[in-house]
């Protein structure tokens, strides 16, 4: 028996949150969160509860809120850019850079999208834009795809900045819009076409690949994504 998972998201989120974004041991009175896990929980909640649907939401607002958290952690404003087409001001994308020590080494990119599929209230048992935890599971539009990964990546950058961590390579965080509606707008494609220098990296960690664990939790393989729609 095998269990599938998004290997990168799980690896990052596991260190950041106590009651995981999937299952946990059920308890009526969960243990209090440590300060770092509480900080992640607050970031995750803010991101999930920011409506980023195409019809009525704003990716720009979502990435502005994440940028404010990065700025508060000490990441220089000069190392963050929010970019959107002039005719699509709500489809903003955030590029944030944690500077490394080796200027010759190509960057690593942490890539996640913050837009979500439409959510009609009538179709949901709960408000789709209110993060709810029940029996060890989180419920809301985007709680998994892809705001869990976006929150994990942003939280990692917040921690790195606040702790003064200096990686060898630059680490780029790209929070993008339009993954769910590429026929209307594709943030990654637009960034590559218009801001290629900001998107250049040795490789990117993205949601598109994945991996498997066996029944005991031992890693079996990690898939590699070779392209992005």
Residue ranges of each PLM-predicted region?
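Positively charged n-region of N-terminal signal peptides that target proteins for export
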Residues: 1-4, 77
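Active-site-proximal flexible loops/turns
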Residues: 9, 58, 119-122, 152, ...
């Amino acid at each position: 028996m095998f269990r599938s998972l998004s290997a990168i998201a799980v690896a990052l989120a596991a260190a950041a949150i106590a009651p995981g974004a999937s299952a946990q041991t059920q308890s009526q009175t969960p243990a209090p969160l440590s300060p770092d896990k509480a900080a992640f929980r607050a970031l995750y909640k803010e991101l999930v509860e920011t409506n980023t649907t195409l019809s009525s939401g704003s990716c720009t607002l979502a990435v502005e809120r994440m940028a404010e958290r990065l700025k508060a952690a000490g990441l220089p404003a000069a190392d963050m850019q929010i970019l959107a087409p002039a005719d699509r001001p709500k489809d903003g994308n955030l590029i944030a850079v944690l500077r490394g020590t080796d200027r010759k080494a190509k960057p690593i990119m942490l890539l996640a999208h913050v837009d979500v599929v439409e959510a009609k209230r009538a179709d949901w048992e709960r408000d789709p834009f209110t993060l709810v935890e029940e029996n060890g599971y989180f419920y809301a539009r985007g709680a998994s795809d892809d705001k869990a990964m976006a929150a994990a990546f942003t939280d990692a950058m917040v921690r790195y900045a606040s702790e003064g961590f200096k990686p060898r390579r630059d680490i780029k965080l790209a929070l993008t819009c339009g993954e769910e509606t590429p026929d209307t707008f594709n943030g990654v494609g637009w960034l590559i076409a218009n801001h290629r220098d900001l998107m250049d990296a040795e490789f990117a960690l993205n949601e598109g690949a994945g991996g498997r664990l066996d029944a005991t939790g031992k890693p079996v393989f990690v898939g590699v994504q070779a392209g992005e729609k």
